A protein has these predicted regions:
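Acidic-basic catalytic patches of nuclease active cores, encompassing PD-(D/E)XK
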Residues: 2-45
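Globular "head" domains of long coiled-coil molecular machines
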Residues: 43-55
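Active-site beta-strand-loop-beta-strand hairpin of nuclease catalytic cores
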Residues: 57-64
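Short, flexible loop/turn elements at secondary-structure junctions
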Residues: 60, 69, 108-110
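Active-site ExK catalytic segment of metal-dependent nucleases
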Residues: 64-79
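Glycine-rich, highly charged phosphate/nucleotide-binding loops
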Residues: 79-91
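Acidic metal-coordinating catalytic centers involved in nucleic-acid phosphodiester chemistry
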Residues: 89-127
Length: 127
């Protein structure tokens, strides 16, 4: 693959990320993860119980993912930080006994804008 090919594919990838929000982005993320990691299991919400803070995980490795992709990420940074903490609490109380949490990833589609200090601070609080 040439450098030009790689740059074209990178541009296509960023274009897709930029265009997707909400469940459409989550489905895109799941498709990538299933191709990259055969053991990845997406979790669908169950009635009023939801997904209990887990949008997908790799059970053998204890690696969990929570996905959040608002339409306007810069307007939702405070909400994202609160969601990150709340969802990790749900994850810890519901999923840790199923597969011990070893790694946690909050997948925030910032649409290339960069992550705010609020989200970084919320992640630091979990450590």
């Amino acid at each position: 693959m040439t450098v030009l090919d790689k740059n074209y594919l990178r541009l296509q990838f960023w274009n897709r990320i930029y265009q997707k929000s909400g469940t459409e982005f989550q489905s895109f993320f799941e498709d990538i993860m299933k191709k990259a990691f055969p053991d990845f299991q997406p979790i669908k919400p169950y009635g009023n119980k939801g997904d209990r803070g887990n949008d997908g995980y790799r059970p053998d490795n204890g690696i969990y993912y929570q996905v959040y992709s608002p339409e306007n990420p810069s307007e939702k940074e405070t909400e994202a930080a609160k969601k990150l903490k709340a969802d990790f609490g749900k994850l810890k109380s519901s999923w840790d006994k199923i597969s011990k949490i070893k790694e946690y990833y909050f997948v925030f589609n910032d649409k290339g804008q960069g992550v705010s200090i609020e989200i970084e601070s919320a992640l630091a609080d979990l450590k």
